[in-house]
Amino acid sequence: ELLKVEILERHCNYNLKNLKRIVKKLHNLGVVIAIDDFGTGESSLGMLNEIPVDEIKLDRQFIKIHNDSIQDQNVRSLEKIPESVLGLAKRLGKKTLCEGAETQEQVDFLKTVACDTVQGFYFSKPLEEEKFLELL
């Protein structure tokens, strides 16, 4: 579990048979497999049964809904997408990570829908190695 390989969702349909073979080999080596940008590609939900992934990384577009330009009624309606996807991932036994959190409101929302891990500029922008080491 020291190494994680991320597969972009849009690449899952190119050669499914080959991808399944590679993922199986990586799993046998103890590599964690994640699907990145989940929900932005053209693959079906059935793909989650086809490819044995450990983690689903929900694309940031699904949490961008929390901003001042969207009316409250629309926010409540749009919240159902990440809530449903994260719930499905949990029921399938997958870990979840949501990308792109920039505000406290977004982080709070992701806590309420039980997202395992949250990443984004709210916590830190990309850092040079020296600055990163200072944080440790």
What are the functions of these language-model segments?
Residues 21-29:
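Catalytic-core regions built around general acid/base machinery
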Residues 2-16, 29-136:
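EAL-family c-di-GMP phosphodiesterase catalytic domain
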